[in-house]
Structures are given as structure tokens and as C-alpha cells.
């Protein structure tokens, strides 16, 4: 469905990630893990909805974390739309990699960069629905300065006994005490058998496809219990 939107709030972080809160002209239902398509200067740009479906008056999008022209252009577009209160168009909701909240299986959530927005929606929904099974969240970034939601996730892990948060930094450039390297390698190191897990993945396209291939071949992951919109493309 097509909606006209306005930007109601923009939150910047030290890591150059922007949380953009947009308000559609009509509320619509979506599932945790779905995304919107923003029409921007003749381009169709997908953004995961970062908030829980129970909070649908404003949609939270995470923008940035990349020097790619599309990311810079999107940030500029949203900031200008906020300053001048210009309307823009989205198409929503989209995506089949939504949370299967009826499942009792443990959850493995894997995010790369701003792929955390997708994972954040799923995690927030798990908390809202009081799901009690173990939840493991692995978040991989290039350097620790890009962990823009690190404290928020640490707080949730401390508050809920079933949530385990594991940040992974690929390039060490400071006094980092956590895991170092590729986020998929970190998962491989920590698990021997993923056959019972529901696995949700979001990040760069190559990372998502690599996660699928490696976790199935090396860790017995069940393809029927793995979810990522990247899996829809060959």
C-alpha cells in the first residue's frame, strides 16, 4: 500500500547512524521484521522497520553507516524532509522474514551494521509478547564506533535473563574487550548444532547469503527455520 509520510524526528549518533521517525498519513499493520520502500529521487530504497508492531503510529528507520552514495543521499533527503516538513511516499509493508512468534524454538538473531534495525524490531516484539525461550543476538560491525545501540542492548540483556547480546568488532582500533572478527565466524565458534534454532539474519547481502550457506553446511541449521529477505534472491 502507498502512504504519504512526514519525518517527525531525527536522532543522530556519534557513529553517523541516524534514527529517522516517520509518520504515515494512515496507520497500517505490519509484522516484526518487515520493511518499507521509500521513493527517493526516482529510486526505490528499502528500509527495515526498527520498531515493534504494537508501536505503529511512528515508524523508526535506521539510516547511514555507509559512505555509499545511496546512504548519503537518503540521509540528506530525510533531514531536508524534516526541516521543511516535506511529504514523501512509501510503499509498505513488505517482506516474508517476519518473526514466527508461535514457535517455541530458541532464537538466533544475526545483524550486520544497520541490519540491526530489522533485528531490533524482532527483539522488541519478543519482549512485548513475553517470549521466554533463549535469544542470542550477534551484532557485527566494522569498528566499535558503529555500535550505536550497544548500551541499549546491554541494558536489555541485563534486564531479561533469556536475552544474550554478543557484539562482534571486525577491525580493532581501540581498547575493545569483546569478540573480534567476522560475526558469522563468531557464531560458528560459539555453537555446535543449530538444528533447533529459528535463525533471523539481516545485513549486507553477501553476509546474509554466507550465513545461510555456512550455518546449514557446518552447524546443521534447518533451512525451513532460517529467515532473511536476502534469501529470496539468487
UniProtKB/Swiss-Prot annotation:
Pyridine binds at residues 112-116. Disulfide bonds: none annotated. It holds the Pfam family NAD_binding_1. SUPFAM superfamilies: Ferredoxin reductase-like, C-terminal NADP-linked domain, Riboflavin synthase domain-like. One of its GO terms (molecular function) is oxidoreductase activity. Keywords: FAD, Flavoprotein, Luminescence, Oxidoreductase. NCBIfam families: PRK08051.1. Belongs to the Fre/LuxG FAD/NAD(P) flavoprotein oxidoreductase family. This is Probable flavin reductase. The lineage of its organism: Bacteria, Pseudomonadati, Pseudomonadota, Gammaproteobacteria, Vibrionales.
